Structure formats: C-alpha cells, structure tokens
C-alpha cells in the first residue's frame, strides 16, 4: 500500500513545484521585502539591504535592479508597501550625517509611476539624534488608504544597562506618506 501511495504522489509533487527565480546574488542581498500591486498583480517591487530595489512587470518572471537614494540616507531594513491607488512605498532606516546621526529616523520614499520608477526623496517619522530608530513595519488600510507604521526606538542600541530602555512608536499618514502624525 505504501509503495502504491508513493508512486501516485510522485507525479503530483513534480508538477506542484514552482520555478525558483534568482533576482540578485551580487553583494549578498538580505532582509528582503516584496509587495505585489493589488490593482495590477503583474507589478511587483522588492527591496533588500542596504539600498537595493528590484522591479518586475510580469508577475515576477523577470526583474530589473535599481539603487535607492535619499538625502536622509538609506541604511537598510527595507519594508515595501503598495497602496490601493497603485503607488509603491519603500520604508527604510536613515543614515544621518555625523557619527551619532545614524538610525535617527524612519524614512518613507514613494514611487507613484511604475513605468518611470522615480522615487521621492522621502518623508520621515521619528527624528532624534540621541536615540536609534529600528525595526519598522508598515501596513495599509485599504478602506481609506491610510498607512500605519510601528518601530522601535532605543535609548542606546544593544545596551545592557537597566537605565536604557526601548519604546515602540506608532505613526500614521493620511496623505500618501507626505506627512506623519
């Protein structure tokens, strides 16, 4: 009985496999995030550390590669989102100026035209040179297109002191990522 069951299962196992597509191997991309446009499922955007962005317009069969830039700096932890209007967002850590300025805020960059692939310089939430902002995550409410973000703010990153704390922050945007409350 077990042999017959195994023989019958083999063809279905082979047919059920999906093609694994390697998007990029240069620089060992890590911490990937990917999102499919809910209004056009052929359009996909992916991000990887530190500033890599990838585009597919054929439902992930082929990809093109880009590099994200911002005057706020781009320092990894990508989170990709697409709103109900089809605009893509790339959230990431900042790389502020000065030795103590890195991770001083969470940056939101927006791409409204998939064909053009131009990203805004970005808006941001947080902004504290004395604390480290990290571990952001984003969701979109499809009923009103609001964007919600949470992230962690550390008094001192990796500190073991009892006097140093970490806090979970929350922010929302009701205007497509232009401003944050």
Q: Where are the regions a protein language model picked out?
A:
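Bacterial Sec-dependent N-terminal signal peptides
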Residues: 1-18
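C-terminal PAP-associated
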Residues: 16-181
